[in-house]
């Protein structure tokens, strides 16, 4: 709570992201303090413990007039109830498809869509460093096959879409622009677009027409399609 006090003093945002993803419960199951807390609070298991802790932190933020964002992992299973100031960020399409999205909507939680297929711009265009063909994507994949593209008309609980570029797995500064551009243009088009999108060929033509402008602004513009990348593209 001391940390949240400091965060709230520093950042006026209505939303505070509290994480909650990739918390394997093996160590929790063996931890005497965790087992003691589970027993004391009459919780079912370690996942329920995470929900309980998440609820305490979200409630604390609620007292400050803030909303708490959690990664979708916290609602893979039902358990200890979360308060009504919670927003779920759905990310793990690769591991759990739309489980977090469905569970969030079922519990009436607003959702931010930002799946690792195809909004994680650290994922390469072509296979690289253990990223197999299944974990690559190009401009066309984003535009036509992005599971995060859920128009708000589909469900009023969908707040919108996010994108990320994680740099913890070998992505260097020199790679960043070419990972971001032009794929982020397809994401931007989906984020602000309403109604039926134009066909991909028309969109692709517009992207190519803007490449020189981006380069004149100092950005490195990567290949748009996998077939344009060649075998040495990073």
Language-model region placement:
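Short acidic/His/Gly/Ser-rich catalytic and metal-binding motifs that mark active-site loops
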Residues: 25-30
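Substrate-binding groove of N-acetylhexosamine-processing glycoside hydrolases
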Residues: 1-15, 22, 36-234
């Amino acid at each position: 709570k001391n940390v949240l006090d400091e965060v709230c003093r520093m950042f006026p945002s209505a939303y505070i992201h509290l994480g909650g993803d990739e918390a394997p419960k093996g160590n929790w199951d063996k931890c005497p303090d965790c087992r003691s807390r589970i027993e004391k609070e009459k919780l079912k298991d370690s996942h329920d413990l995470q929900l309980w802790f998440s609820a305490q932190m979200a409630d604390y933020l609620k007292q400050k007039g803030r909303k708490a964002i959690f990664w979708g992992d916290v609602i893979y299973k039902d358990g200890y109830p979360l308060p009504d100031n919670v927003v779920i960020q759905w990310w793990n399409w690769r591991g759990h498809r739309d489980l977090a999205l469905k569970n969030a909507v079922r519990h009436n939680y607003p959702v931010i869509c930002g799946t690792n297929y195809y909004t994680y711009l650290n994922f390469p265009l072509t296979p690289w460093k253990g990223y197999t063909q299944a974990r690559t994507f190009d401009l066309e994949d984003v535009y036509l096959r992005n599971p995060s593209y859920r128009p708000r008309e589909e469900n009023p609980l969908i707040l919108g879409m996010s994108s990320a570029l994680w740099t913890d797995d070998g992505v260097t500064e020199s790679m960043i622009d070419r990972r971001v551009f032009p794929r982020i243009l397809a994401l931007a088009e989906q984020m602000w677009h309403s109604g039926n999108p134009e066909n991909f060929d028309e969109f692709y033509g517009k992207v190519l027409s803007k490449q020189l402008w981006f380069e004149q602004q100092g950005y490195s513009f990567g290949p748009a399609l996998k077939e344009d990348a060649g075998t040495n593209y990073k």
